[in-house]
Swiss-Prot record:
PANTHER family: F-BOX/RNI SUPERFAMILY PROTEIN-RELATED (PTHR31900), FBD DOMAIN-CONTAINING PROTEIN (PTHR31900:SF27)
UniProt keywords, alphabetically: Leucine-rich repeat, Repeat
InterPro entries: F-box-like_dom_sf, F-box_dom, FBD, FBL13/AtMIF1-like
PROSITE patterns to which the protein is assigned, alphabetical: FBOX
Domain FBD residue range list: 416-466
Name by which UniProt lists this protein: Putative F-box/FBD/LRR-repeat protein At4g03220
A Pfam family the protein falls into: F-box
Keyword Repeat: yes
Residue windows of the LRR repeats: 148-172, 175-200, 235-259
SMART domains: FBD
Domain of life: Eukaryota
SUPFAM superfamilies listed in its UniProt record: F-box domain
Length: 498
């Protein structure tokens, strides 16, 4: 039989246990911590939590970040609509402490609904707006965005048809706080020359600009004093590009200048540029660097040419490469090497030396007519440490099987390389790592590999990565023994096969 003392202790323990169960410790946390908890959940789960109590409803309606992309799907438009977003925004309080930091959504929408959503977001002083919309017609750039005094970052993308930019006169004086801007599928047939749109009066604080799929754009000038990153992609009709900015550090232009205009031009005035990416663009008629790119660290050039006015295109490519002569790292695409290998290429032009170059990557077919070009490029890189050669395999390439007896032929490629040893002395004294991709044990790549092994005094490692077409293990073993059989200039050199 329990005593009164034992009963009291037992009852006290039960009351303490019930108290722990009844107390909602999470709800009593500060709003900032509860917001962090809700932000870790998908928005749909956070909305469901708001049904628990008035406290959680208030927390949900005061979330600083709303990401509706986690609950909607453009491929299934019936699963979500702009009305749902509008209702959530409408229920929010307009207190200063309840401002909207960021809003993201992907939704099919009419222009009227889109304008209402953006107006409501601007009313809540949104700072970061990231939206992608599907519409049944072209639409105009929402004017509420232009006049917002709180917007810091904007991403506007049309998933199908596109939108029109406001006139330059309307943009001037707007976007005063914007630091990041990304626009995709812009319709510019009525204003093909944007020479005074992306300038300081309209974008005094802009640091990052991304433009993609600008239809009808022919000439573009970007001149914002605080701009640090600029990317332009898929503007096929572009004929002229002018970029200037003392703080610009990264410039990326991809898939542009497809109009084949005889007056196409590029002007670059970015003295502090560190990264230059020029990918899949047609060679322009002229290139002008108004300042030396002495801060350049990385450059990538992949171009293609059209069969009109070849002389100006070749000269344009040389001007482009010469403007990149201060780069630490350079990657050249296959067409760039082919243009340099043309009859009017390197034989009649001279590249400025790349004294700062430490890393060089070349994409090439490695045909016989490429050999002199490679030699000239190596001469232009006297301090190079790392060389990567990616061999492009196609049906038109001359790929003769390697035969060790070719060493004795006076007209073989290896003899040409041997004749270049003196002029390549500095290059050979600094080269440490070589990697050849697409190695199929043909004469072209074997001649290059043997030459670098025989004369590379600083060589540490040569990596040969075979093409998937070459999996003959017996032949690979024979090639390995032949390569190691030649006397190497460096006692540290090792050969790795993959």
């Amino acid at each position: 039989m329990e005593t009164r003392s034992v009963k009291r202790k037992k009852k006290k323990k039960e009351e303490e246990a019930n108290w722990f169960i009844r107390v909602d410790r999470i709800s009593n946390l500060p709003d900032s911590l509860n917001h962090q908890i809700l932000l870790l959940l998908p928005l749909k789960s956070a909305a469901q939590a708001s049904l628990l109590s008035k406290r959680w409803r208030s927390l949900f309606l005061s979330l600083p970040d709303l990401d509706f992309t986690s609950i909607n799907d453009l491929k299934n438009p019936k699963s979500f609509s702009s009305n749902s977003i509008y209702k959530v925004l409408s229920l929010r309080s307009h207190r200063d402490s309840n401002n909207l930091r960021s809003l993201r959504f992907r939704v099919p929408v009419t222009f009227t609904s889109l304008n209402s959503l953006i107006r409501l977001a601007v009313t809540h002083q949104v700072q970061d707006l990231d939206i992608e919309v599907t519409t049944k017609d072209y639409f105009n750039f929402p004017r509420w965005i232009v006049t917002s005094q709180n917007l810091r970052a904007l991403t506007l993308k049309s998933a199908n048809l596109g939108f029109r930019l406001p006139p330059s006169s309307s943009a001037r004086g707007g976007f005063q706080k914007l630091t990041s801007l990304s626009l995709s599928r812009v319709i510019l047939h009525n204003q093909p020359c944007l020479s005074d749109f992306f300038t300081d009066p309209s974008f005094p604080l802009l640091e990052k600009l991304t433009l993609e799929c600008c239809f009808g754009l022919k000439e573009l000038k970007v001149s914002c004093r605080l701009l640090q990153e600029f990317s332009l992609k898929n503007s096929l009709q572009l004929e002229g590009l002018e970029v200037s900015g003392n703080k610009l550090q990264k410039l990326k232009v991809e898939s542009c200048f497809y109009s084949y205009s005889e007056k196409s031009f590029v002007k670059i005035n970015t003295p502090n540029l560190k990264t230059f990416l020029w990918n899949s663009n047609a060679v322009t008629t002229s290139v002008h660097f108004l300042d030396k790119l002495v801060c350049l660290r990385k450059a990538f050039v992949k171009v293609f040419w059209h069969h009109q006015d070849l002389n100006s295109q070749i000269q344009s490519l040389f001007t482009l490469l010469s403007g990149l002569c201060h780069s630490y790292k350079l990657q050249l695409g296959n067409q760039s090497v082919e243009i340099l290998s043309s009859k009017k290429g390197l034989l009649k032009n001279h590249l400025l030396p790349f004294h700062n170059m430490r890393f060089l990557e070349l994409q090439t077919r490695l045909n016989r007519h490429n050999v002199q070009t490679l030699s000239c490029l190596f001469k232009s890189c006297p301090m190079l440490n790392i060389l990567t050669v990616k061999i492009i395999d196609d049906q038109t390439s001359e790929r003769r099987q390697w035969n060790k007896d070719l060493w004795d032929m006076s007209n073989s490629e290896i003899q040409y390389w041997e004749s270049q040893a003196y002029e390549l002395e500095s290059f050979l004294n600094h080269l440490e790592f070589v990697e050849i991709h697409g190695f199929v044990e043909c004469e072209n790549e074997m001649s290059l590999a043997i030459f670098l092994l025989r004369h590379g005094k600083a060589l540490i490692k040569m990596t040969l990565r075979s093409s998937f077409l070459c999996r003959d293990s017996l032949r690979r073993q024979m090639i390995r023994s032949q390569l190691t059989g030649f006397s190497m200039a460096s006692s540290k050199a090792k050969i790795s096969f993959h």
